């Protein structure tokens, strides 16, 4: 909130349960099911990938429970920053918040780049006017312009008011679900169970494990619900936060399981893992028509819009919160007097997204791996804070389960020798983010 000589200026209170679900689920499920389906299946096979997402997602339910309890007690946009500040030092509180900002923010330029790639797939003429190459990958002017245009649109929406942003999120989230049901329902009528083979690409344990490693990245978002906690309507019932968080996780698990099963069912997936946008290709092969590809790509674009917007909302609220608490420059805690939005934080996220777009997907894709660890750090810290607060014994047990899950998800990515562990690029990206955070903290 912001004080002036006449009144207290707070964030606008206009969000309902359906808005929080659209935010949580919409922030979680992006376009990975189209862009990197080949990677998921090569990691685990059809059954390995389904089990990886199902088990990994189920392990997030205790963490979702803890978030539901914390936001009910502390409906603060600071989220993990506020929770850890209750029981830990300001340094730990800031470090946790800074990691969570990375988890949300890194998705924004990734999605901005992805929309250009999808547009280029639909209209090949857009794969032209190469500006430069990074790590051997071209950066095209039309792709940049499309991504910058979308970034500008979402910046304006979020600057202008949370109700505009929430309406956009609802339409894109439920539109994604409707089109998803359409293409899956039609496509599977043409498939065969014989196409599932092989069920695992490695041993069953390794297959499931390799997929579970990436679950934190592809299921980050349910906790974005708490970042909008201060913007609930005055009549909002506090239990609505818990419902939205759990619904987001459960629907997310079902979405990933269904789309993986559908891709494995409709065509012999093993023969098509080299194809760009494999999900669209397998459905086109099964149906024998391009119309289903257009439906899938439209679904992906809507999904991209919602996950971009959801992460934009969450990142800007956290940046606003650390500014309001004086952990970085306090000007970031400014609330627009008319729009009642964290306007300066919104502008910073928009500008940073636009700048990072110029790195291209060659840099952004490996850097995005850091987001999964950043998310797990936030989950671990939130559960540890809840445990330290001292709830009843059974709730402390759930919190400890959340701590263990968060810790294991971190270790799966950073311990050398474990398949899929951090490369030098990921460590470099994480180190740079830490340096930026320390610089902002020391100059606050």
What is the meaning of each model-derived region?
Residues 39-42, 51-52, 61-151, 156-159, ...:
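Hydrophobic transmembrane alpha-helices that form the core helical bundles
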Residues 370-372, 387-388, 393-444:
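A generic transmembrane alpha-helix motif of multi-pass inner-membrane proteins
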């Amino acid at each position: 909130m912001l004080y002036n000589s006449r009144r207290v200026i707070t964030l606008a209170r206009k969000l309902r349960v359906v808005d929080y679900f659209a935010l949580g689920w919409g922030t979680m499920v992006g376009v990975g099911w189209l862009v990197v389906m080949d990677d998921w299946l090569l990691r685990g096979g059809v059954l390995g990938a389904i089990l990886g997402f199902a088990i990994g997602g189920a392990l997030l339910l205790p963490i979702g429970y803890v978030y539901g309890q914390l936001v009910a007690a502390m409906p603060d946009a600071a989220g993990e920053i506020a929770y850890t500040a209750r029981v830990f030092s300001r340094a730990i509180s800031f470090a946790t918040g800074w990691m969570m900002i990375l988890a949300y923010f890194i998705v924004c330029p990734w999605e901005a780049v992805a929309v250009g790639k999808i547009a280029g797939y639909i209209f090949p003429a857009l794969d032209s006017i190469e500006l430069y190459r990074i790590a051997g990958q071209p950066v095209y002017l039309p792709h940049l312009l499309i991504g910058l245009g979308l970034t500008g649109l979402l910046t304006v929406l979020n600057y202008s008011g949370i109700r505009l942003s929430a309406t956009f999120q609802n339409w894109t989230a439920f539109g994604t679900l409707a089109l998803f049901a359409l293409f899956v329902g039609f496509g599977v009528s043409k498939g065969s169970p014989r196409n599932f083979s092989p069920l695992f690409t490695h041993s069953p344990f390794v297959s499931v494990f390799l997929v579970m490693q990436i679950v934190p990245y592809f299921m980050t978002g349910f906790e974005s619900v708490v970042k909008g906690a201060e913007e609930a309507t005055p009549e909002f019932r506090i239990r609505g936060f818990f419902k939205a968080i759990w619904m987001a996780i459960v629907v997310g698990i079902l979405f990933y399981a269904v789309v993986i099963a559908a891709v494995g069912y409709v065509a012999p997936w093993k023969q098509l893992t080299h194809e760009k946008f494999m999900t669209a290709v397998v459905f086109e092969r099964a149906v024998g028509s391009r119309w289903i590809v257009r439906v899938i790509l439209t679904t992906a674009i809507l999904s991209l819009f919602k996950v971009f917007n959801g992460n934009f909302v969450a990142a800007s609220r956290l940046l606003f919160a650390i500014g309001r608490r004086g952990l970085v420059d306090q000007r970031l805690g400014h609330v627009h007097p008319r729009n009642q939005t964290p306007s300066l934080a919104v502008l910073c996220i928009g500008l940073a997204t636009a700048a990072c777009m110029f790195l291209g997907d060659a840099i952004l894709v490996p850097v995005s791996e850091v987001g999964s660890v950043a998310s797990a750090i936030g989950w671990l810290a939130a559960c540890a804070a809840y445990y330290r607060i001292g709830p009843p014994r059974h709730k402390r047990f759930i919190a400890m389960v959340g701590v263990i899950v968060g810790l294991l998800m971190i270790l799966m990515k950073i311990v050398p020798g474990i398949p899929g562990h951090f490369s030098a690029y990921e460590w470099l990206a994480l180190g740079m983010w830490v340096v930026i955070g320390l610089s902002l903290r020391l100059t606050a």
